[in-house]
Amino acid sequence: MIIIKSKREIDIMREAAKVTGEILRDIEGFIKPGMTTHAIDNFVEERILHYKMKPTFKGYGGFPAAACVSVNDEVVHGIPSRDRVLKEGDIVSVDTGSTYKGYCSDAARTYAVGEISDEARKLIDVTKQSFFEGVKYAMVGYRLHDIGHAVQEYAESNGFGVIREYLGHGIGRDLHEDPQVPNYGDAHTGPHLKEGMVLAIEPMITQGSYGTRVLGNDWTVV
């Protein structure tokens, strides 16, 4: 069931999202070669707590950290580790959220570690723009799959693929609510978008096949 949010609820969620966004901006100047993915997670958690909010991800479904930190071919849900050391040329995705007054936020960003290849830079740039292409359709008057259609069309027109198995979603008191928001699909299909719906739009773009598998830790997707 899609839960429509009131203006008061959306205002609370906006505060949570502002904190998450600020943390993701701050990470850009923090990440460097030689750093562990655990250090990134520690930075994220300390910042969330500084704002008197709760790390949305920590403990969710048993996830052990405040942030998913996924490196290179890891698509999502990377578990931070003291043993995983970033090196020059890596790209790293940090996915996190802050909970405020019982309402969740959820956002991700991908970063370059030092100097990266032109191909890796293009992947980051196309993924970012595909998000904004989808957001153009997150408005009353459009339908849900217009969002995914725009993401897919932009990514594929630039020579990249779109992950099928992992999706965006509604968000509110629960991190994952209805509806699921795929990053692909046919335009003019799916539920009509209504005022008060809150969506996490999460393009996952790949240089290779869109097929995925889960590693032995039961979390990390490659």
Outline where the language-model segments fall.
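Active-site neighborhoods and metal-handling regions in enzymes and metal-associated proteins
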Residues: M1-V222
